[in-house]
Amino acid sequence: MGLYFFPKEERLKKQEDFLRILREGKPYSLSKNFVVYIRKGAEKRRIGISVNKKVGKAVVRNKIKRLIREVYRLHRPYLKEDIEMLVIVKPGENIKNLDFHKVKEMLIKIWEKAGILKK
């Protein structure tokens, strides 16, 4: 496979994994609507995405998840290997208007703040 892929092993799906990251991870955010919990020292790099039902209908929530997954997929080679992250999106004014560039900008700033980008 190429460099930019998103294998199933890197997806967080189980509730226990989400709860562990919420408990052990450190929260980072740029706004109250977009929070990323990052747990360092994991066995492998993994990501989970949670979009609150109050954000909008399923179409809107799924679009936001796809945008986050795509930013992660493209920047995956530049992230450290031993992290688990949980992206939580809550309802707010500008959340429905998110586009690829806004999501990319927010996630990169959070990743820099957390120090998980490779040098």
Swiss-Prot record:
The GO terms this record gives for MF are: 3'-tRNA processing endoribonuclease activity; ribonuclease P activity; tRNA binding
What is the top-level taxon of the source organism? Bacteria
HAMAP family listed in its UniProt record: RNase_P
Please indicate if the UniProt record lists Nuclease as a keyword: yes
* EC annotation from Swiss-Prot or TrEMBL: 3.1.26.5
Ordered alphabetically, the record's keywords are: Endonuclease, Hydrolase, Nuclease, RNA-binding, tRNA processing
Q: Name one GO biological process term.
A: tRNA 3'-end processing
Family affiliation: Belongs to the RnpA family.
Q: Which reaction does it catalyse?
A: Endonucleolytic cleavage of RNA, removing 5'-extranucleotides from tRNA precursor
* Gene3D superfamilies according to UniProt: 3.30.230.10
Q: What is this protein called?
A: Ribonuclease P protein component
List the SUPFAM superfamilies.
Answer: Ribosomal protein S5 domain 2-like (SSF54211)
InterPro entries in alphabetical order: Ribosomal_Su5_D2-typ_SF, Ribsml_uS5_D2-typ_fold_subgr, RNase_P, RNase_P_CS
Record-linked Pfam families: Ribonuclease_P (PF00825)
Q: How is this protein organized at the quaternary level? A: Consists of a catalytic RNA component (M1 or rnpB) and a protein subunit.
Main function: RNaseP catalyzes the removal of the 5'-leader sequence from pre-tRNA to produce the mature 5'-terminus. It can also cleave other RNA substrates such as 4.5S RNA. The protein component plays an auxiliary but essential role in vivo by binding to the 5'-leader sequence and broadening the substrate specificity of the ribozyme.
Keyword hit for NAD:
no
Q: Gene Ontology terms, cellular component aspect?
A: ribonuclease P complex
Q: List the disulfide bonds.
A: none
